[in-house]
Regions:
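Active-site loop/helix belt of alpha/beta enzymes
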Residues: 1-109
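Charged (often Lys/Glu-rich) extended helix/loop segments that serve as interaction or gating elements
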Residues: 70, 80-224
Length: 224
C-alpha cells in the first residue's frame, strides 16, 4: 500500500506555486489513499538566501518563514483532527548552500569585435550552474592584472573557456577588467560541481575558509 507522497518541482519557487503544491498533495492523499499518509515530502525548489544584487532580479523571493506558513500551516490545519498526523519532509539542498559557494576565476584574454569585448576566463558556465543562463551573478574583482588590454565598460561579455556561444557567464559586465584580473562570482552552489563535465578542463579544486581565515582544500582538482 502507498504510505507516503512525494512531489519535486524545480521551476516554481513562488509562494503561490507552493500553496498549489501542498493543496494538490493533500487532495491526492484524501482522494486516493485509504488512510492518512505516514509522510508527505514536498521536495525542494525554494528560494534561499541571496546577495541583494541577485535577489533584486526576482519579483518576490519568499523567506523560509513564508514557505513554512504556507506548507506547514496548511498541512497542520488539514490534519488538525487526525489522530496520527503525517510527517512533513522537505529537501532544500541547493536552497541552503547556493549562496555559500563562489567561483574564483582569472581573466585569460580580451578580444574586441566591433564594439563588443569578449573576456575569456579560465572556467566555464558549467562551473557556475545554470543560474547564469537566467540571472546576473553577484561578483567581486581582485585587480591583479598586468596586461595592456582592458575591456570596454558595459559592452563586455565574460566568456568561458569552451569557446561555445552559450558559454557566457555574464552578459554586459558593468566594469572594466584586464588580463590577469581575478573575478569571484557568488551564489554558484546549484549543481555546479556535479554537473560539470570533464570537457576542455577537469573540475577545479574546492577550498573552504575556516573561521580563522585559513584555506583548507576539501576537494582536490580532478584529473583525467
Amino acid at each position: 500500500s502507498v504510505c507516503g507522497l512525494h512531489c519535486h518541482i524545480s521551476r516554481a519557487r513562488g509562494i503561490v506555486a507552493w500553496q498549489k503544491r501542498i493543496d494538490n498533495l493533500l487532495h491526492v492523499a484524501d482522494t486516493y489513499l485509504e488512510k492518512n499518509p505516514d509522510f508527505i515530502d514536498v521536495g525542494s525548489g525554494m528560494f534561499g538566501e541571496m546577495d541583494s544584487s541577485l535577489s533584486a532580479q526576482f519579483e518576490a523571493a519568499p523567506s523560509y518563514e513564508d514557505y513554512a506558513k504556507v506548507v506547514a500551516g496548511t498541512m497542520a490545519k488539514h490534519y488538525e483532527q487526525a489522530t496520527k498526523k503525517p510527517i512533513l519532509f522537505s529537501e532544500p539542498g541547493t536552497t541552503l548552500i547556493a549562496k555559500y559557494l563562489s567561483l574564483v576565476t582569472t581573466v585569460d584574454n580580451i578580444k574586441t569585435i566591433k564594439d563588443r569585448c569578449f573576456v575569456t576566463v579560465d572556467s566555464s558556465y558549467y562551473n557556475t550552474g545554470e543560474i547564469v543562463l537566467m540571472k546576473k551573478l553577484p561578483y567581486r574583482i581582485v585587480r591583479n592584472g598586468k596586461g595592456d588590454t582592458r575591456s570596454i565598460v558595459k559592452k563586455t561579455n565574460i566568456m568561458g573557456f569552451t569557446c561555445l556561444e552559450q558559454d557566457c557567464i555574464y552578459t554586459d559586465f558593468p566594469e572594466s577588467v584586464q588580463e590577469g584580473d581575478i573575478i569571484e562570482f557568488g551564489n554558484v552552489g546549484g549543481y555546479s560541481i556535479v554537473s560539470k563535465p570533464p570537457f576542455i578542463q577537469p573540475n577545479c579544486k574546492i577550498l573552504s575558509i575556516t573561521p580563522e581565515g585559513d584555506l583548507v582544500e576539501i576537494k582536490r582538482q580532478e584529473t583525467y
